[in-house]
């Protein structure tokens, strides 16, 4: 986190309409600089100068995906990490098609999704209702399989998060269920992973693990402060924690297990 705050990475967020404000505020809180550029007239230029690119298909359109692919290729040429959040993949054929297109045409550094979304990328049967994926599977094994199949770093989020590059497998147990009651927390996590990847581009597993642990600790601390008040207070306090949390405190509270 100190690296993020010191370097103030520019994160090009091609994210969905529902979460743009929350994503921008969350990235500002951790010390990154968000920019939202969607037009095909400028996405390549913006992706080239940004420190990382987030592609999120929460509110997809054909034109939007065309712009995402242009931006992704530009980020690849510039050597900038691309984070892909396949929101709701598995729910409709359209989301399946555009996810395949992005993965086929863009060199994605990290894929982040819930178990249902990651299973859908592998063509496995799951249940995706809206953007909430539910599947009966070993999340850790799913993560390892997906990383091997997609040949990239995969983050599977859930009660316990998992990160793998196909060889290493790490579990992160931090977090709180109230995150699922605030729209946009999963999408913001993609942006936070992008910020960490921007300052640790050669250690993407470590970047993802540290981002997850930091994010989860912030959620736990926010819950402890607001559990008698409710979700609205939790959301505000969570943003405060993102801005106030130190590496030292997060390190003391993180629950990370290296599985292999």
Curated annotation (Swiss-Prot):
Pathway: Cofactor biosynthesis; thiamine diphosphate biosynthesis; 4-methyl-5-(2-phosphoethyl)-thiazole from 5-(2-hydroxyethyl)-4-methylthiazole: step 1/1. Disulfide bonds: none annotated. The keyword DNA damage does not apply. Its EC number is 2.7.1.50. Substrate binds at residues 36, 184. Catalyzes the phosphorylation of the hydroxyl group of 4-methyl-5-beta-hydroxyethylthiazole (THZ). This is Hydroxyethylthiazole kinase. The gene is thiM.
């Amino acid at each position: 986190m100190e690296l993020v705050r010191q370097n103030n990475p520019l994160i090009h967020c091609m994210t969905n309409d529902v979460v743009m404000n929350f994503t921008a505020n969350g990235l500002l809180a951790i010390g990154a600089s968000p920019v939202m550029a969607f037009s095909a007239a400028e996405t390549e230029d913006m992706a080239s100068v940004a420190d990382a690119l987030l592609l999120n298909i929460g509110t997809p359109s054909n034109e939007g995906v065309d712009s995402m692919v242009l931006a992704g290729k530009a980020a690849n040429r510039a050597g900038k990490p691309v984070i892909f959040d396949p929101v709701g993949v598995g729910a409709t054929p359209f989301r399946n098609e555009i996810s395949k297109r992005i993965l086929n045409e863009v060199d994605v550094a990290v894929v982040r999704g819930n178990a249902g979304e990651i299973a859908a990328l592998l063509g496995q049967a799951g249940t995706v209702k809206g953007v909430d994926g539910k599947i009966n599977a070993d999340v850790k094994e799913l993560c390892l399989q997906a990383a091997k199949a997609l040949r990239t770093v995969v983050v599977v989020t859930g009660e316990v998060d998992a990160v793998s590059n196909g060889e290493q497998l790490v579990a992160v147990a931090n977090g709180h269920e109230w995150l699922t009651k605030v729209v946009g927390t999963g999408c913001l996590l993609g942006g936070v992973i992008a910020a960490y990847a921007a300052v640790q581009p050669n250690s993407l597993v470590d970047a993802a693990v540290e981002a997850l642990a930091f994010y989860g600790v912030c959620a736990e601390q926010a819950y402890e402060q607001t559990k008698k008040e409710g979700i609205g207070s939790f959301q505000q306090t969570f943003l405060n924690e993102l801005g106030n949390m130190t590496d030292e405190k997060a390190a003391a509270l993180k629950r990370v297990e290296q599985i292999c």
